[in-house]
């Protein structure tokens, strides 16, 4: 093979090698949400659920109340870091429902407890019930999309 043909052949091989990794990274192969965002989302659900369960304890004392509220606060901090567009890639309704029902529900409930405002607590519980309705139907499918293959 002469030098000119060798260079041309080498150039084609190099171009092909460049396109193989690009093809491997097509959007179809990308996860719908980053690992960090998946962590923020799932951990916010866990923290808030744990705080909610602790608030339901029949023998809740002042220390237990403070610990439960701290879990709710930590869950909300994580929830505020979740990007809506990532959630929408998992399910078109997820971002809106997460914000409107889950986050606002927890905020209302949390603030109602702190202020001793039963009406605000009830509003929070009403919103959380709407979230629970959505999550009970779609949660399993959404969580399956978050699991790495």
Positions of predicted regions on the chain:
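Bacterial N-terminal signal peptides that target proteins for export
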Residues: 2-13
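Intrinsic disorder/low-complexity segments enriched in polar/small residues
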Residues: 7-9, 84, 122
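Sec-dependent N-terminal signal peptides
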Residues: 13-20
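C-terminal motif of bacterial Sec signal peptides marking the signal peptidase cleavage site
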Residues: 22-24
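C-terminal amphipathic alpha-helix
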Residues: 29-68, 107-149
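Short, solvent-exposed, charged loop/turn and helix-capping segments
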Residues: 69-97, 143-149
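Heptad-repeat alpha-helical coiled-coil/4-helix-bundle sensor or tether segments in soluble regions
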Residues: 96-107
């Amino acid at each position: 093979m002469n030098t000119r043909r060798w260079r041309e052949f080498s150039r084609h091989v190099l171009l092909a090698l460049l396109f193989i990794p690009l093809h491997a990274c097509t959007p179809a192969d990308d996860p719908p949400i980053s690992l960090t965002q998946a962590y923020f989302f799932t951990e916010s659900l866990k923290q808030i659920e744990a705080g909610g369960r602790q608030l339901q304890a029949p023998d809740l004392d002042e220390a237990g109340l403070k610990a439960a509220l701290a879990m709710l606060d930590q869950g909300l901090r994580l929830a505020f870091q979740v990007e809506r567009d990532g959630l929408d890639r998992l399910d078109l309704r997820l971002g809106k429902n997460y914000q409107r029902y889950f986050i606002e529900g927890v905020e209302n409930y949390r603030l109602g407890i702190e202020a001793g405002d039963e009406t605000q607590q009830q509003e929070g519980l009403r919103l959380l019930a709407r979230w629970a309705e959505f999550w009970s139907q779609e949660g399993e499918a959404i969580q399956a999309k978050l699991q790495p293959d």
